[in-house]
């Protein structure tokens, strides 16, 4: 069995049929085989294939179908009397083709207009429809529905109101490719797209005229029913048989003859005829079909107008598959067509292969700088190391909200998003407006590639700052989500012609082609699936006669900006001069690259994030000290960067390639709190916006007690306590009026209340459980305000929404300075200050006094200092303060600061510090010990490492240090050495410390910390011993200038300078926090139908449905087993007095009296006159059982018997009516997750999240500025005299070693004031000033633009169960549910009426004694059962909440009456419940009816006695064993019996109150007494 046909093969076969007249396989029989006559075909050579449904469905041979003669055409078949169906294998032995045309000539009947029915349907082997054509009489439309490839249904709807005018119509449905079209009376009604569908399998049945709901045949008349295997044959069909006058002989009967061969007229309109596009099939070159296709096209061309003479409006050229096969000359290109309507969205193409690596940086010419392209965005990096901690600067006040910025220009289209999940099954929306009809042709030839457009106009935005050169591209980021399609933009200018490409591969078939008005020759099809990427093309041949390329179409509007990608891995910048050999053993740390050239000014950006802080406002009132937050979680170390790739050269010219870094990744994980130096005092910010609503204040003073409310309704009774002490004997109860005779020991109705008794002793039971809360009383007036209460514990609820802005408050008083707060976040960089006033020129200081001693010997190496705080800021960069750490994970119950925590993890090194001041020369130490032999080779590597990590620390070329084994002679002056270990190497150690700590574990001993900063000069050493007098030295050269004096004390803080001019624009800030979610986007276009989801888990039980319809009576159940006696229940509550019941049944017969003594035997007297009937004699002894007598006649209906014993569960009855709503059940267990629902509407914007933690440290900064010059060396020794009087100018000498300090000179005169100095660098941060006063609240700013849509938040925790909702209005009647499970066996029916009196039986044997205890127990149980039912009835009338909240509060005020709820939607039928467990044994039933009469006994031996007087009735016999008879009809009301004599005196009653359960059964349920004022019922 062929399950699917390739559309290409199918079309191929069709063309083969048309060209050669061959049969299309064996799937479609020929018209000769089927008896099909295409009388109106204009092409006799066309071979018609298809199926004659009238023949294949045996309609002519079915006797139930009425045949009516038709003088104008074929017989009329009146369907509807019998189902029209046949197995699919008989109708379509090899299945139905993918493309076909269904032709039906029908007349619909009026009584079918109320139904929805299938005109044509093919089902599968399981009875599910594979394809169906449904008539929707309500909407006057046809719906074609077929099974899609993913198992769901694909469908399209055609409005056809003309079918319902009670006249004959020819209906033609053609399915070709992805398009379905409907023609009514040879006029196109509509064409609709049809999704991909499965092929029709021959496993099921074919139906004509089937009711969709009841499955019955539908009545309509039929003349013609057949299927063509070529969907185009509907154009060859004529409609003469349904036209009133038929067709004139000279008129063409085919619509195709009236049109061009390739143009299809769809519908006459006011502006003229509308034609669809010409279609040509494209097949592979040199295939066998080309000749056939060309042959057929040439035949058609011969039948139409010659096309080589130019094409008119009604003509189309034949399809030229290549220039070699056709000599067609095309005319000049037409005018530019108007903007076409937007086509239907094509299905998404297959995912393209990964593209080749793109070029990175290109050198256009040898002298030009590198032009670099931004690399792809990297993935999100891991958390960076902890940033350098800094002390917080004083926080300025919040600035005023800036003015709303101008709206940015529309952004460029976003990157394509990831493929969405398959959509859920969508319900077909409301019927759309009638679209323009049109057939879809085969796919057109691939167009020539258009010329590239000119570059667009430059953007309007300000020029961006020059970008830093980037590193290698990061790994490919995840695919962003799809942006919303933007509107179409204006068309670009025509571009210069590009290199033409070769012909691309064949594309997929096109979708529905919208029809265009006449004269529009620039036809454009709907977009198909994106084809695979074509190979680079060769130059296209310039054939003569081809038209010029049309103008480029309008450009669409850009889409909404795409989602931000994840953060890439950090990479160092690469410069063009860095090779791989410079990176050393530490991969991934590149040196800073050269600054890139300024980019072309970009377009104006979207609205920016929050602006920088304004000028600092006046200091605010000090806030209360906040608790010190716990240290944040240490972030994971980021992965090292890949080494910079070597520069690659391209072959096409002198181009060099350098990677630039990708865009910045997202903000990393928060770092720990920093501990850096305090920042400078920021300027006061502008007045801030009104803050969010503050936390709730402390509770107020408790109010005075309010007025006592009205008493609430009494609660439900508590659990019964233990029995109290026995009371005194009460008065006897009166007998219940409804019980007579032997039942007098049952308690009677309650009497009037007696006098109030003395209070009894206190009970000894436990207190009962609290009763249900009473209904709230009437709300009392509010009490006076109470006194100030104690502050409550901190709340634990979620943060509430921001309240409305309050009115502006008065400024508060100056508070006391608070304690130092936790480190604050770094403030924004302030504006450039204006230069301060020029200071006065100070006097020249006097030279220092003192005699310079001889140089001391070098001292020994001091002990290693304590590890100081590492701070390695990059030279020339400010020291940044760290952001405060993220809030701790746990909130304590107290808001007091906790104890001192353990020391935090050492922070990462900061950037290199600023150069220190010139230190004071130290004293020479003692001579050192000879050094050990150094390992050559390690130091250069270490130096290289340090250089790569810390920057160029040496400020010049470094010399390898000399490795001394023993003291040698003094060498020449060396080049300045590498800076000490304490600045650069400690940075390296600090960076490597976390790895070492991870490898070492938590409990191992820590490594020594970084070396501290240079210490202050130590105290002067003790004077050394006087040395031997040396020889007098030569007069030395003048000494160098003395050392710089010690740093003076810090001066007083200067006056605040004037406000400076605005500084240059700062660098772009970090990305701001994510804005609130945006407004809901524009509703997207409908997606393709997604695959059906897997069957979901069973959902939670649905709410109780509405009452169903009355079900039929169930069959009579079998008799159930006798239940055991239940235990005696607790004493019930005092009930209301019941109504007097109806008269009770006659009492049981009295006990048989003792037989009297036998009298003397009398002689037989003469037969006297028949006397009157004597009194009944005493009962004789029971006789032996008699022989089974014949069955008596059916007796009259007896009276209702007593209830029988509980029978066995009967078979399941039909579903009964739905009962009233039951009590609210307890909250069920959480259900299993249901299937994914439809996408909901976007929710409201969420509340602002907590501030994010500090970001990870940035990449290494650029190389710092050169350091200050070194110290002057000592003067060298004089050289020998020169050869001549004047020597040549020598090279500049190497600076000599530093000389000893010269003798102090005489104090000089004060010098002239020097020129004013350059403005000094920023001084150290000043002390924290006192906080300013609280500023006034500013007015609320204007409403900001809606932010972009926020990311989807994580699923919240499961909320607590809500309060039960009020009952909704009753919904409409739901559909009838499936048959329920078997019900329990019904109770036995009521006994039938009493039969006719039978023949008197023989006296029975002595019966058992009547057990009155059983009778009393039974009556008591019945009464208790009635009481329970009455209690349940009253309880259901009370509107108490069935569940009490877990933490009950005080009763609230009474709520207002709620408005009646809207009717709820009808619930879906519930699933059949599980079969219940076997019930407990029921109560014993009432005594059974007397058994049937026994068989007649054998005739006894003895002398026949005389006829005695009729004996009294015998005692009750044992129960019989006959089967229960059928329920008899209701008997008539019997005559009231004679009142019996009063019974004997009953036994004394039990002590205590009357048990209401003994009397309650007499109260009818339907009536109610008004409550007595002196009594209270169960609910007061």
UniProtKB/Swiss-Prot annotation:
> Where are the annotated segments for Nonhelical region 5 (NC5)?
871-881
List every stretch annotated Triple-helical region 8 (COL8) with 1 imperfection: 525-570
Q: Where is this region: Nonhelical region 9 (NC9)?
A: 510-524
Q: Where is this region: Triple-helical region 9 (COL9) with 3 imperfections?
A: 375-509
Spans annotated as Triple-helical region 3 (COL3):
968-982
Region Triple-helical region 7 (COL7) with 1 imperfection: start and end of each range?
587-640
Q: Where is the signal peptide?
A: 1-21
Provide the protein's localization: Secreted, Extracellular space, Extracellular matrix
Keywords, sorted A to Z: Cell adhesion, Collagen, Extracellular matrix, Glycoprotein, Hydroxylation, Repeat, Secreted, Signal
Q: What is this protein called?
A: Collagen alpha-1(XVI) chain
């Amino acid at each position: 069995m062929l399950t699917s046909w390739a559309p290409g093969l199918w079309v191929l076969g069709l063309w083969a049929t048309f060209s050669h007249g061959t049969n299309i396989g064996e799937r479609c029989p020929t018209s000769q085989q089927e008896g099909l006559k295409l009388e109106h075909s204009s092409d006799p050579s066309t071979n018609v294939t298809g199926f004659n449904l009238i023949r294949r469905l045996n309609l002519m041979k079915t006797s139930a179908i009425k045949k009516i003669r038709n003088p104008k055409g074929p017989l009329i078949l009146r369907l509807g009397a019998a189902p029209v169906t046949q197995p699919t294998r008989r109708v379509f032995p090899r299945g139905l083709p993918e493309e076909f045309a269904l032709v039906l000539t029908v007349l619909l009947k009026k009584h079918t207009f109320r139904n929805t029915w299938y005109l044509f349907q093919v089902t599968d082997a399981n009875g599910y429809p594979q394809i169906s054509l449904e008539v929707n009489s309500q909407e006057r439309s046809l719906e074609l529905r077929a099974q899609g490839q993913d198992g769901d249904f694909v469908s399209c709807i055609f409005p056809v109101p003309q079918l319902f005018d009670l006249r004959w119509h020819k209906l033609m449905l053609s399915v070709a490719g992805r398009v379905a079209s409907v023609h009514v009376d040879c006029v196109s009604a509509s064409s609709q797209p049809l999704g991909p569908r499965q092929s029709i399998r021959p496993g099921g049945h074919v139906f004509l005229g089937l009711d969709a709901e009841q499955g019955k045949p539908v009545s309509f008349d039929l003349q013609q029913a057949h299927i063509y295997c070529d969907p185009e044959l509907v154009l060859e069909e004529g409609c003469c048989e349904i036209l009133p006058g038929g067709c004139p002989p000279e008129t063409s009967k085919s619509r195709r003859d009236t049109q061009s061969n390739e143009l299809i007229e769809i519908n006459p309109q006011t502006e003229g005829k509308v034609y669809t596009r010409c279609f040509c099939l494209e097949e592979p070159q040199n295939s066998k079909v080309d000749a056939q296709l060309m042959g057929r096209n040439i035949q058609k061309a011969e039948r139409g107008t010659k096309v080589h003479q130019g094409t008119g409006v009604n003509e189309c050229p034949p399809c030229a598959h290549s220039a070699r096969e056709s000599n067609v000359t095309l005319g000049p290109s037409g005018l530019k067509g108007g903007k076409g309507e937007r086509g239907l969205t094509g299905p998404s193409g297959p995912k393209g292969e990964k593209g080749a690596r793109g070029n990175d940086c290109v050198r256009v010419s040898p002298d030009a700088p590198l032009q670099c392209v931004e690399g792809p965005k990297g993935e999100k990096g891991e958390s960076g190391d902890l940033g350098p901690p800094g002390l917080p600067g004083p926080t300025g006040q919040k600035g005023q909200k800036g003015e709303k910025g101008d709206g940015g220009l529309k952004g460029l289209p976003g990157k394509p998003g990831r493929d969405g999940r398959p959509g859920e099954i969508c319900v077909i929306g409301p019927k759309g407006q009638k679209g323009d009809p049109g057939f879809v042709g085969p796919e057109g030839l691939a167009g020539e590639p258009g010329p590239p457009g000119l570059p667009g106009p430059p953007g309007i935005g300000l020029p961006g700052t020059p970008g830093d050169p980037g590193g290698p591209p990061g790994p490919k980021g995840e695919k962003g989500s799809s942006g919303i399609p933007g509107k179409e933009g204006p068309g670009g200018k025509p571009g210069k012609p590009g290199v033409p490409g070769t012909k691309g591969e064949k594309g997929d078939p096109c979708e529905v082609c919208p029809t265009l008005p006449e004269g529009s020759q620039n036809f454009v099809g709907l977009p198909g699936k994106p084809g695979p990427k074509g190979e680079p093309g060769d130059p296209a041949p310039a054939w003569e006669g081809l038209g010029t390329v049309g103008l480029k179409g309008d450009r669409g509007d850009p889409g909404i900006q795409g989602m931000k990608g994840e953060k890439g891995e950090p990479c160092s910048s690469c410069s063009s001069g860095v090779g791989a050999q410079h990176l050393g053993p530490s991969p991934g740390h590149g040196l800073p690259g050269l600054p890139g050239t300024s980019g072309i000014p970009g377009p104006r950006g979207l609205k920016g994030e929050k602006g920088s802080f304004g000028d600092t406002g006046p200091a605010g009132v000090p806030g209360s000290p906040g608790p010190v937050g716990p240290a944040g979680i240490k972030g994971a170390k980021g992965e090292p960067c890949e080494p910079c790739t070597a520069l690659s050269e391209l072959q096409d010219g002198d181009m060099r390639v350098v990677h630039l870094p990708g865009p910045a990744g997202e903000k990393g994980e928060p770092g720990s709190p920093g501990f850096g130096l305090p920042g400078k005092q920021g300027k006061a910010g502008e007045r801030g916006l009104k803050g969010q609503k503050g936390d709730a204040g402390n509770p107020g003073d408790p109010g005075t007690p309010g007025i006592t409310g009205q008493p609430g309704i009494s609660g439900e009774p508590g659990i019964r306590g233990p029995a109290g002490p026995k009371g005194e004997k009460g008065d006897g109860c009166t007998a219940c009026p409804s019980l007579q005779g032997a039942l007098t020991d049952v308690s009677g109705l309650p009497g009037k209340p007696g006098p109030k008794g003395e209070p009894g002793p206190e009970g000894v039971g436990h207190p009962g459980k609290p009763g249900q809360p009473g209904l709230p009383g009437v709300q009392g007036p509010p009490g006076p305000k109470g006194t100030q209460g104690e502050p409550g514990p901190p709340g634990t609820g979620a943060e509430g929404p921001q309240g409305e802005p309050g009115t502006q408050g008065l400024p508060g008083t100056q508070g006391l300075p608070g304690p130092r707060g936790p480190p604050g976040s770094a403030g924004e960089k302030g504006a450039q200050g204006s230069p301060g006033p020029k200071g006065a020129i100070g006097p020249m200081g006097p030279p220092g006094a003192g005699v310079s001693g001889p140089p001391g010997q070098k001292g020994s190496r001091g002990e290693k200092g304590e590890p100081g705080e590492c701070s390695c800021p990059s030279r020339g960069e400010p020291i940044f303060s760290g952001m405060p750490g993220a809030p701790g994970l746990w909130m304590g119950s107290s808001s007091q600061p906790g104890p001192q925590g353990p020391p935090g993890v050492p922070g990462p090194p900061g950037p290199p510090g600023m150069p220190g001041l010139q230190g004071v020369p130290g004293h020479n130490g003692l001579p050192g010990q000879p050094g050990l032999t150094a390992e050559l080779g390690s130091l250069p590597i270490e130096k290289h490492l340090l250089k790569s990590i810390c920057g160029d620390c040496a400020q010049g070329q470094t010399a390898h240090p000399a490795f001394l084994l023993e003291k040698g002679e003094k060498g020449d002056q060396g080049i300045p050495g590498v800076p000490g270990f304490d600045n650069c190497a400690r940075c390296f150690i600090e960076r490597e410390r976390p790895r070492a700590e991870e490898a070492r574990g938590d409990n191992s001993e820590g490594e020594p910390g970084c070396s501290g900063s240079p210490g202050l000069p130590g105290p002067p050493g003790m004077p050394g011993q006087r040395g031997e007098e040396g020889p007098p030295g030569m007069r030395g050269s003048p000494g160098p200038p003395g050392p710089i004096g010690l740093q003076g004390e810090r001066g007083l803080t200067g006056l605040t300078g004037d406000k400076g001019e605005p500084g240059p624009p700062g660098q772009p800030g970090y990305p701001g926090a994510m804005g609130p979610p945006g407004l809901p986007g524009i509703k997207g276009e409908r997606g393709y139908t997604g695959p059906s989801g897997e069957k979901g888990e069973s959902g939670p039980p649905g709410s109780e449905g509405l009452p169903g319809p009355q079900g039929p009576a169930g069959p009579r159940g079998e008799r159930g087993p006798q239940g055991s006696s239940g235990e005696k229940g607790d004493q019930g509550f005092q009930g209301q007095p019941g109504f007097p019941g109806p008269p009770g049944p006659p009492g049981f017969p009295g006990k048989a009296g003792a037989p009297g003594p036998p009298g003397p035997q009398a002689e037989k007297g003469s037969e006297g006159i028949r006397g009157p009937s004597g009194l009944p004699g005493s009962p004789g002894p029971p006789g032996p059982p008699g022989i089974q007598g014949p069955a008596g006649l059916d007796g009259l209906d007896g009276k209702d018997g007593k209830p029988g014993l509980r029978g066995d569960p009967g078979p399941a009855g039909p579903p009964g009516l739905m009962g009233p709503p039951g009590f609210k059940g307890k909250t069920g267990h959480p259900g299993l997750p249901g299937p994914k629902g439809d996408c909901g509407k976007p929710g409201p914007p969420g509340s602002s999240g907590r501030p994010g933690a500090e970001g990870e440290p940035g990449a290494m900064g650029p190389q710092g500025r050169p350091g200050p010059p070194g110290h002057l060396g000592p003067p060298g020794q004089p050289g020998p005299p020169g050869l001549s009087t004047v020597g040549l100018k020598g090279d500049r000498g190497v600076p000599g070693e530093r000389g000893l300090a010269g003798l102090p000179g005489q104090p000089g005169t004060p010098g002239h004031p020097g020129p004013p100095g350059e403005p000094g660098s920023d001084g150290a941060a000043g002390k924290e000033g006192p906080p300013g006063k609280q500023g006034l609240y500013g007015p609320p700013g204007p409403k900001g633009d809606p932010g972009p849509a926020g990311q989807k938040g994580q699923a919240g925790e499961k909320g607590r169960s809500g309060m039960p909702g009020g009952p909704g209005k009753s919904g409409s009647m739901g559909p009838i549910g499936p048959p329920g499970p078997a019900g329990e066996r019904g109770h036995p029916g009521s006994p039938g009426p009493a039969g006719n009196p039978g023949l008197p039986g023989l006296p029975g044997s002595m019966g058992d004694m009547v057990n009155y205890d059983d009778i009393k127990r039974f009556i008591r149980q019945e009464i208790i059962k009635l009481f329970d039912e009455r209690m349940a009835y009253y309880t259901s009338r009370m509107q108490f909440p069935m569940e009490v909240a877990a933490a009950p509060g005080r009763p609230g005020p009474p709520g207002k009456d709620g408005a009646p709820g809207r009717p709820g939607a009808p619930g879906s039928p519930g699933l059949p419940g599980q079969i219940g467990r076997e019930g407990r044994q029921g109560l014993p039933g009432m005594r059974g009816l007397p058994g049937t009469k026994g068989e007649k006994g054998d005739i006894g031996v003895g002398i026949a006695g005389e006829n005695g007087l009729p004996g009294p009735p015998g005692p009750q016999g044992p129960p019989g064993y006959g089967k229960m008879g059928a329920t008899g009809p209701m008997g008539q009301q019997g005559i009231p019996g004679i009142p019996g004599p009063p019974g004997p005196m009953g036994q004394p009653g039990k002590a205590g109150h009357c048990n209401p359960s003994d009397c309650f059964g007499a109260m009818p349920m339907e009536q109610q007494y008004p409550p007595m004022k002196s009594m209270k019922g169960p609910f007061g």
